Amino acid sequence: GKGLSGGKLIVVPPKDSTIKPEDNIIIGNVALYGATSGEVYINGVAGERFAVRNSGAHAVVEGIGDHGLEYMTGGMVIVVGKTGRNFAAGMSGGIAYVYDPDNTFYEHVNKELVEYKNVKSRYDEDQLKEMIQKHYQYTNSNVAKKILDDFGNEVAHFKKVVPHDYKRM
C-alpha cells in the first residue's frame, strides 16, 4: 500500500485465522505512505504512521498506531477503532472520520492544524455509510456489521476531522 496510486487494496486475515482482526495489527507501519489515489479496506489494525502524506486515497481501517494521517493533504480515512497519539499532526487537507463511542479521541488528536466535531450533515452520513458498507462487503468485518446494523444511532459516535484551512473555504 505504500505509494498507492489507484486500484483497490483489501487486507483481511487468512481464512483459517482465529485472531480477532479489530484487536490485532494486520498491516505494518507506514502503510499508505504518500498514496495518491485508490481505495483501501483493512479488516484489522494498522501500525504507526498510517496514511502519512496521503494526498488522495480513501481508506477504512479498524484502528491505527501513533502519528496516523501525519502531513495528509487529501483523500479520506475512516477509522472504526482506536487511534494512537499525535493523530493528524501537520494534516493540511483531506478528511478523516473516527469512530469514538467512548469519547476518548480528544486525547489522541493533535489539534494544531485540525479541528474535530460530531458528524451532523447528511452528506457526511451518506459518505460514511457508503464506505463502511464497502468495507463490510469486501472484508466481512464484524465492526462494520455492528455499525451498519444500527447506523442511525452509531453515526453519532463518529468525529469528523478537518484542517482549519478547510473550514475557511
Predicted feature residues:
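Long, distal/terminal scaffolding or interaction modules
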Residues: 1-169
